Amino acid sequence: MSYTFTRGPVWKYSQSVQYGSHENIPRLSYSTFLPHFEFQDIIPPDDFLTSDEEQDLVLFGTMRGQVVGLRYYTGVVNNNEMVALQREPNNPYDKNAIKVNNVNGNQVGHIKREIAAAVAYIMDNKLAQVEGVVPFGASNTFTMPLYMTFWGKEENRNVVLEQLKKHGFKLGPTPKTLGSSLENAWGSGRAGPSYSRPAHVAVQMTTDQLKTEFDKLFEDLKEDDRTVEMEPAEAIETPLLPHQKQALAWMIARENSKELPPFWEQRNDLYYNTITNFSVKERPENVHGGILADDMGLGKTLTAIAVILTNFDDGRPLLSKRGKKNHPGKEYKDETIKRRGSNMDKKEDGHSESSTCGEEPSISGTPEKSSCTLSQLSSVCPKRRKISVQYIESSDSEEIETSELPQKMKGKLKNVQLNTKSRVKGSSKVKEDSKFALTFFASATQRKMLKKGMSMMECSEACDTGERTRATLIICPLSVLSNWIDQFGQHVKSEVHLNFYVYYGPDRIRDSAWLSKQDIILTTYNILTHDYGTKDDSPLHSIKWLRVILDEGHAIRNPNAQQTKAVLELEAERRWVLTGTPIQNSLKDLWSLLSFLKLKPFIDREWWYRIIQRPVTTGDEGGLRRLQSLIKNITLRRTKTSKIKGKPVLELPERKVFIQHITLSEEERKIYQSVKNEGKAAIGRYFTEGTVLAHYADVLGLLLRLRQICCHTHLLTNGMSSSGPSRSDTPEELRKMLIEKMKIILSSGSDEECAICLDSLTFPVITHCAHVFCKPCICQVIHSEQPHAKCPLCRNEIHGDNLLECPPEELACDSDKESSMEWKSSSKINALMHALIELRTKDPNIKSLVVSQFTTFLSLIETPLKASGFVFTRLDGSMAQKKRVESIQRFQNTEAGSPTIMLLSLKAGGVGLNLCAASRVFLMDPAWNPAAEDQCFDRCHRLGQKQEVIITKFIVKDSVEENMLKIQNTKRDLAAGAFGTKKTDANDMKQAKINEIRTLIDL
């Protein structure tokens, strides 16, 4: 059978319009996601702040109270110091007890019993967030005054006032002395409590002002010391570009910095936090790290590799002369299997007990002494000796095997299997001498020790016995795991010996003592999270790492996600976040990053919220200045348009984006209009009845069918019942209907958000009322609201036992069903094939990405590609890691006969891939989230691209796709101004969804 692609009416489209340049995780049970509470006698002070509505709080007023029992506790406070109020419901002397803690987590005392009796009810029922500041605290011996400020939702104001009145108290305005102290603080360099300036009297910044400040936040970083360039250690093969040398100098300066952290200064013998007025005798711990927020495609990975090899110890490189020592894996010698792997050898350092067997000569030009200076090793070595490279990986079918490693890295691979169950705890640091401190600052290992009955002293001693590790831990998404391996092989000289271990797969080595002696451990967020959730100690959490690097670090932006909690529990001397998008949705995205960097007092979410987030989002310019000062201290960001010495940071070829309008054929338009009219009538009824959100799955189903028709009528799914679950349905009928609805949502490509965490769905499950949530999120809701938990969207009763997952085999069935249908073309496929054939005629060597959210559509496109003689490859989320690597290698190959087309799913192509072999992108269907498109485009418009990049978006005229572009523009505007806009609450989110539905369906 032949296929003809002509300029006939079957592929009609209008003139192009240019609008700009520019793992396999095991299933977990319901109980897995139930919160495991330790220290039930203490309620964390930031518990109230975990609400999605935290930014809708208004100031109710202030009342004066007293802190008593000062002589019994070690915590001290200064004048005008902010303090945290924390409920202690299991206090044996007073069930209403409220602790007062200073910023460091040390207890100062308790709120006076009479006041606590009134306030405890308010805190327990989350009617208000109660915050404290001590106006005069420095010289008090027995009691001290305390101003308590109440913030809450407007609808709770009267309940709070009545509760206080019942106990003889009332709220008043914030004292002028407190307000004036704040206003004077910034002039004098001493900050007062950020909350004392009420939100309702603040001068609200306009949307344009906020947008401008957001745009400038990362781009206004003054060059000052950041223009200094530094050459990497001679172990680096690839010459660094000027902006990478600047980043290297800045990052090493940050790692070796002896400066005080932001907002700290020394006054006589004390160290003061100028924001909270807290002081300590001990010098605050330095922040050895930061955020490298360079734009996507500017070579952050190479910069990070240069830091690892250049700065091992106080400016000395990781490389030094090695002696005759045992191989770190000698104890597993009998279990060692050799196979081909990479072109880099293991390399050891004289400071560690690990070394290759026998004596290895040092690199030419390396001083004999291990105490050599950085400058002695900064020049590129003229002589190179080729020595085979060894990698250490776990053996497993899911691991990256020989065939999936880059060609440049084929060499000797030592594969170590481990059956031992030994554990060695790495050194850790107990931050404070109290259970409170352990609750908030201790590592997972410390808390588990404490839970097992060990005393705090024993816990501290046990965790401090480990030796200093040499290892850097790199955590990345699975999709870029192979890219890191490739980058090490490409950028590190072959004569350099590294102990490099990929911690991935079920047979991964779990011996923390052995892991700590490697140079580099590479793993994924999913593996880290999985280990963190296991009953035994996670080996990665048992080590105090030399350095932890988070690639695509914005992955931890959701503070409630298990993934974020797993990352925050890691112990390390130095910490780095690599991300091109540090703020994706709103200012709250930054807290997890700052918490990871261990920047006190922002480790505690309450202080972040009181000092930065709330002031900024309510338009307080002081809060904005604090945020800018903080960001400028710990962040380096350059965009593709940034300039160094008058020249662009990266001279990339131009990127052009075109919209190619498509006109549906008469048959396609008829089907489209029929489905639209039927769905429009049903949705109209939902609006009339006020049940549109209760039928949200049905609405998504309609939108999905319309989008599928725009691509190909074969994608059209079966119609769904517009009614919800019926009481007459049998359990099996109900299950089938719910699974069908869930499949529609999961296959819609909408990147649908969970209404609880407001993030993309992870471990999606569907309730009996047909709403889809993240499994961890909905399980926590059910647990906290037992026994009468209600759906967050429709308020119907829900139960953990009734949550349904979509079995992978059912999704596979749908795919098989599609492949059995007789193939035919569509208007979009005709337009694509015409463009590809025309492109091949002009230049047969040009490579293209064909991108779609629908993997079944990509399968349909394969047929005409084969018929027209195109050599192509494919990359989508259903492929195993080995297949992904092979596909990328084939596509990046420049030899004759290599694929000129890659069929790419939008999600698989959104993170970390380097596909700069392609210079043409054809986006077959628009995404709900425009950022997802931009990330995909940056896979080829990045460092290494030599040709002009042309992107073509296929959009069907007079269709839901055109309306999606309108919503995309709205989302772009919101993203640009998200820095200063208020975070949407649940009601705003619902209304936004309703408005989007009206726009999409033309209601």
UniProtKB/Swiss-Prot annotation:
Coiled coil: none annotated. A motif (DEGH box) lies at residues 551-554. Its EC number is 2.3.2.27, 3.6.4.-. The modification Phosphothreonine is found at residue 730. GO terms for biological process: chromatin organization; mRNA transcription by RNA polymerase II; positive regulation of transcription by RNA polymerase II; protein ubiquitination; regulation of neurogenesis. The gene is Hltf. One of its GO terms (molecular function) is transferase activity. InterPro entries: Helicase_ATP-bd (IPR014001), Helicase_C-like (IPR001650), HIRAN (IPR014905), P-loop_NTPase (IPR027417), SNF2-like_sf (IPR038718), SNF2/RAD54-like_C (IPR049730), SNF2_N (IPR000330), SNF2_RAD54_helicase_TF (IPR050628). Residues 317-373 are annotated as: Disordered. It catalyses: S-ubiquitinyl-[E2 ubiquitin-conjugating enzyme]-L-cysteine + [acceptor protein]-L-lysine = [E2 ubiquitin-conjugating enzyme]-L-cysteine + N(6)-ubiquitinyl-[acceptor protein]-L-lysine. Keywords: Activator, ATP-binding, Chromatin regulator, Cytoplasm, DNA-binding, Helicase, Hydrolase, Isopeptide bond, Metal-binding, Methylation, Multifunctional enzyme, Nucleotide-binding, Nucleus, Phosphoprotein, Transcription, Transferase, Ubl conjugation, Ubl conjugation pathway, Zinc, Zinc-finger. ATP binds at residues 294-301. The lineage of its organism: Eukaryota, Metazoa, Chordata, Craniata, Vertebrata. The keyword Nucleotidyltransferase does not apply. It comes from Mus musculus. Residues 353-373 have a biased composition (Polar residues). Residues 433-600 form the Helicase ATP-binding domain. This is Helicase-like transcription factor. Its main location: cytoplasm.
